[in-house]
């Protein structure tokens, strides 16, 4: 029997050991960031009964709720998997571990494609990583803990009767299996590359599956459990200068910057994403760059271990499951030769324009139920076609005005989630591990945006007393506003200072003119909502104002700005952008697309601040105007 204990709106779910033979106990404890509750409900179920509906509560999404389409959004994040199938996979990797014990010391073997449609990284499946098992002993899952319900994955901790813990990552089925397949294959290979070639500490991956045909019945990654604390625990972006926590602040900047330095340390031979070379046997060879991923490898075990293939950067795949993959997506995903870095921007624009055109066609044919104004989609087409058009001229790749331009244009590994929330410091050795690499790709450093935890595009204030006239005479509210701007400026400056210390040849990538030149592309990469195409337009119009100066300084390819905007175009843009800003200010939780952390949601619902409607949606009750 499996014993489940379930409580509503949990942040932590635990499956504990039962004394009964062949049984595990599943416990879901309500424990949020703000509130901790010991209330729980226990449910019993058989270990071998994967279809028992009593288990479902353990797999449901519980970390937040949505104001709109809450039921549908939670159903998209339902991560039911086969515990019995997980048991079988664990036993398989221990069998492989015994076989690997016979391999010569230091030998790095290629991944093994198993008959059960999983892949094992046998160089990681060794006794020093997973422990040993007696010849007649079987591995048994004793505890399952749901330790994180993230934006894209559910993370489970798996304890066994061998006193060995693992992490099981299950991606939410927000996209089709083809998308998840590319993403998982690339992420696993990239982490392998980071570990074996770049010397970056990452959790060891033991086994993975890219579709639901494997014993787990879900795409999954089974990897090493790292016990420790997230680096985010030490990060305070609004710390006062000279605070007692200054060392912690400095250490966070250093740790994240050191990871970035290792990521970009090796120049690669193409733009795209990293895959295992033996993925070729089941795929199309034209997907992959034929030449070596990098030059000068002398270790025969690493030669031809990896290849560059289609980019899995999230913006290229987001909300595109309705496109014909081979005809409408694949031509724009790369890989791209290192002589054509600006093709990344061009193809990003062309793919998004194709996506908007298809959505319009589907809507006109009556085959789409999405609530989207045709005008917005038509404006998106214009915006993204403009981005594609300007791409070849954004940077003069032969300019001498930007120092070390060729270094900035070389393919280097880019990690989109370089953040203290994605770094754990292990308990024993106090070593930092970079946790997941989803969406990692290779692109020129000049097109790589700053990590989100230090990114700041607002007014720069480097010294409150010098930059702000009569600062001491301001009201407390005004001082707080300027102090916020100063601290955000300081954080970004400290990051860029560390970049200069670690990689001085790359520092010009953060020069203001370079930031402005890449800003339309960055806005496209970071777009979260339908209306944010306006931020791309805004960046393009800002470039229009300074293009002549950039041309005079040999920064861009064309003397004349490549795009045409009429007076009416600009006026309409200003009006639409103003409406977007007003919407963001007036619409509660617009920044999170209506998602609210569950503890906050419960509190607001119980207080009457959120009201449930007849259709299942929620509205935020506006405060009554004071008379």
UniProtKB/Swiss-Prot annotation:
Q: Where is the transit peptide?
A: 1-43
* Cellular component terms per the entry's GO annotation: mitochondrion
Localization in the cell: Mitochondrion
Q: Does the keyword Mitochondrion apply?
A: yes
Q: Which InterPro entries match?
A: Kinase-like_dom_sf (IPR011009), Mito_inheritance_9 (IPR051035)
Into which family does the record put it?
A: Belongs to the AIM9 family.
The entry's protein name is Altered inheritance of mitochondria protein 9, mitochondrial
Native organism is Saccharomyces cerevisiae (strain JAY291) (Baker's yeast)
């Amino acid at each position: 029997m499996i014993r489940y204990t379930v409580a509503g709106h949990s942040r932590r779910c635990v499956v504990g050991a039962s004394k009964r033979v062949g049984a595990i106990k599943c416990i879901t404890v309500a424990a949020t960031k703000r509130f901790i509750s010991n209330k729980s409900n226990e449910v019993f179920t058989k270990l071998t009964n994967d279809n028992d509906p009593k288990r479902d509560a353990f797999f449901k999404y519980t970390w937040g709720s949505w104001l709109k389409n809450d039921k549908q959004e939670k159903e998209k994040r339902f991560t039911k998997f086969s515990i019995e199938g997980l048991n079988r996979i664990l036993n398989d990797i221990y069998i492989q571990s015994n076989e690997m014990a016979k391999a010569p010391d230091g030998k790095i073997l290629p991944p093994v494609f198993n008959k059960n449609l999983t892949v094992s990284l046998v160089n990681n499946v060794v006794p020093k990583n997973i422990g040993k098992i007696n010849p007649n002993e079987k591995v048994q899952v004793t505890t399952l803990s749901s330790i994180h319900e993230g934006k894209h994955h559910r993370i489970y901790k798996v304890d066994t009767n061998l006193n060995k813990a693992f992490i099981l990552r299950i991606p939410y089925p927000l996209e089709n299996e083809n998308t998840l397949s590319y993403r998982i294959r690339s992420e696993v290979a990239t982490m392998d590359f980071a570990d074996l070639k770049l010397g970056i500490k990452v959790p060891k991956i033991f086994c993975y599956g890219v579709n639901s045909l494997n014993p787990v019945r879900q795409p999954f990654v089974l990897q090493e459990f790292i016990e420790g604390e997230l680096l985010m625990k030490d990060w305070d972006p609004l710390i006062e200068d000279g605070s007692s926590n200054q060392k912690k602040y400095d250490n966070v900047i250093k740790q994240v910057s050191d990871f970035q330095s290792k990521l970009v340390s090796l120049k690669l031979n193409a733009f795209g994403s990293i895959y295992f070379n033996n993925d070729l046997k089941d795929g199309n060879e034209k997907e992959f760059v034929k030449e070596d991923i990098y030059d000068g490898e002398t270790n025969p075990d690493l030669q031809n271990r990896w290849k560059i293939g289609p980019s899995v950067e999230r913006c290229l795949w987001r909300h595109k499951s309705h496109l014909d993959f081979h005809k409408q997506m694949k031509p724009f995903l790369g890989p791209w030769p290192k002589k054509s870095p600006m093709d990344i921007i061009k193809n990003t624009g062309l793919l998004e324009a194709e996506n908007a055109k298809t959505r319009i066609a589907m809507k006109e044919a009556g085959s789409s139920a999405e609530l989207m104004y045709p005008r917005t989609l038509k404006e998106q087409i214009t915006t993204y076609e403009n981005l594609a058009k300007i791409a070849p001229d954004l940077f003069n790749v032969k300019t001498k005005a930007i120092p070390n331009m060729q270094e900035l244009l070389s393919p280097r590994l880019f990690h989109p989630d370089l953040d203290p929330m994605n770094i754990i410091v292990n308990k024993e050795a106090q070593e930092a591990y970079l946790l997941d690499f989803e969406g990692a790709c290779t692109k020129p450093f000049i097109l790589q945006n700053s990590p989100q935890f230090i990114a700041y595009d607002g007014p720069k204030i480097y010294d409150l007393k010098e930059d702000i006239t009569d600062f001491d005479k301001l009201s407390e509210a005004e001082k707080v506003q300027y102090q916020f701007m100063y601290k955000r400026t300081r954080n970004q400056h400290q990051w860029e200072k560390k970049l200069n210390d670690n990689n001085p040849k790359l520092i010009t990538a953060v020069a203001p003119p370079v930031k402005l030149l890449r800003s339309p592309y960055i806005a496209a990469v970071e777009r979260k909502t339908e209306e944010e195409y306006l931020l791309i337009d805004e960046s393009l119009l800002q470039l229009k104002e300074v293009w002549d100066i950039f041309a005079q300084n040999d920064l861009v390819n064309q003397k004349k700005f490549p795009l045409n905007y009429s007076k009416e175009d600009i006026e309409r843009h200003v009006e639409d952008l103003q409406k977007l800003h007003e919407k963001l200010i007036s619409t509660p939780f617009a920044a999170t697309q209506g998602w609210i952390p569950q503890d906050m949601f419960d509190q607001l619902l119980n207080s009457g601040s959120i009201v449930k409607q007849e259709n299942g949606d929620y509205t935020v009750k506006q405060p009554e105007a004071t008379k």
